[in-house]
Structure formats: C-alpha cells, structure tokens
C-alpha cells in the first residue's frame, strides 16, 4: 500500500510540474483542477451560506404582493438618502473644521 501511495504522490508531483507547460509541439495539457484551489467547504462556511439563503428567503416570503416589493424598495432608498445627507453634513462639518482629508 505504501508503494502505491508513493507512486500516486510521484505522479501528482510530476503532473503539477508539467501543468501549464507546453510540450514539444506547443500544446498545453488541460487538467481537471483549476489554477486556484477551491475553498474547502467547512462547516462554518456552509452554515454562513445557509444563513444568508434563509435570510433572503424569509424576506421574499414576507413580500407577497407587488406593492410590498415597491414599499420595501422605497424604504431602502429613503434610508440610503438619509444616510447620504448625514454623511454630507458630517463632511461639511469636517471641512469647516479644516480636518477633511479625503486622500
């Protein structure tokens, strides 16, 4: 079994060396793996994804009618406008105090 494991490890190392290197005719061998490794699906990551999907689904379930969608969008836009005005006032205050340095 150890000999088999060693043989597999050697083959993987050889494949990794040859990956992306053109042969004598200029062809590049395409493998199953991508260039970047895929993030492993840990339990914490899968829980975060499930939580995000559940939150999104719960919001959609609450909004059954078109007018509810419109109202929620309008509320969201109102919140964004309010935050923008607050930020604008804060910047004006900093400019008045000559402490505003955007860069």
Swiss-Prot record:
Residues 71-100 form a coiled coil. Residues 1-19 have a biased composition (Basic and acidic residues). Keywords: Coiled coil. It holds the Pfam family RRP7. The keyword Transferase does not apply. GO terms for cellular component: CURI complex; UTP-C complex. Residues 1-25 are annotated as: Disordered. Gene3D superfamilies: 6.10.250.1770. InterPro entries: RRP7, RRP7_C. The keyword ATP-binding does not apply. GO terms for biological process: ribosomal small subunit assembly; rRNA processing. It comes from the Eukaryota. Belongs to the RRP7 family. This is Putative ribosomal RNA-processing protein 7 homolog B.
């Amino acid at each position: 079994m150890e000999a088999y494991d060693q043989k597999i490890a050697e083959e993987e190392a050889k494949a990794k060396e040859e990956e992306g290197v053109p042969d004598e005719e200029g062809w590049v061998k395409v493998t199953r793996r991508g260039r970047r490794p895929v993030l492993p699906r840990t339990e914490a990551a899968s829980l975060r994804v499930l939580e995000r999907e559940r939150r999104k689904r719960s919001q959609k379930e609450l909004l059954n009618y078109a007018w509810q969608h419109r109202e929620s969008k309008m509320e969201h836009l109102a919140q964004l406008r309010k935050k923008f005005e607050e930020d604008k006032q804060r910047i004006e205050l900093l400019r008045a105090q000559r402490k505003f340095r955007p860069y």
